[in-house]
Amino acid sequence: MTNSLYLTTTEPRCGKSLVSLGITNLLLRRTGRVGVFRPIIDQKDTLIRDKNIELLLEHFNLKMDYEDTFAYFERDAIDLMGQGKTDLIIDTVIQKYKALESRFDFILIIGSDFENEESAFEVELNAQIAKNLGAPVLIVSRGDKEKISDVQNVVRVAYDTFTNTGCEVVGVIVNRTDPE
């Protein structure tokens, strides 16, 4: 079985790109066979590539076709969810992921971006995907809130959502904190 990690965020601009660069760099020190997979990408135009995927593929010269790195465009996944076809989304994601397992020793799975009003659905869907892929979860959050309790609350909600779904949360990274 391929090792994996599901990287998810609590909100936009948490520093997911930086964290994914660091994790991939560490992984490549241990194995040359690292893959990247984003179950759902938020590109509106199919001609524009996902910036997180593209960054990792180019920076580390990963041996993957771009088309193999994702399962759905966000708009298509939202349409299917609206039709009550969440199971189809999960099944397709599993199928695409399984196709990568034989090619890589480790797959970094990157969750969706939370950049629109459907983000409440995204947390739940990310948790379902992580659970069904059997991937441990690393949560990335922002620390640039007015009160520490606000940061704690956001992290707690994400943590509870994933653990209540049956996922193993292996850690939390809080970026953009005030050093004071």
What function would you assign to each model-found segment?
Residues 72, 110-113:
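Short loop/turn segments at strand-loop or loop-helix junctions that form parts
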Residues 1-2, 97-103, 132, 164:
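Glycine-rich phosphate/diphosphate-binding loops that line cofactor/substrate pockets in enzymes
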Residues 1-3, 151-152:
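Generic structural motif recognizing short loop/turn segments at the entrances and edges of beta-strands
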Residues 33, 102-109, 136:
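Loop/turn-to-beta-strand initiation segments
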Residues 112-180:
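Conserved catalytic-core segment of NTP-binding enzymes
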Residues 4-100, 118-119:
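N-terminal phosphate/diphosphate-binding loop that engages ATP/GTP or pyrophosphate donors
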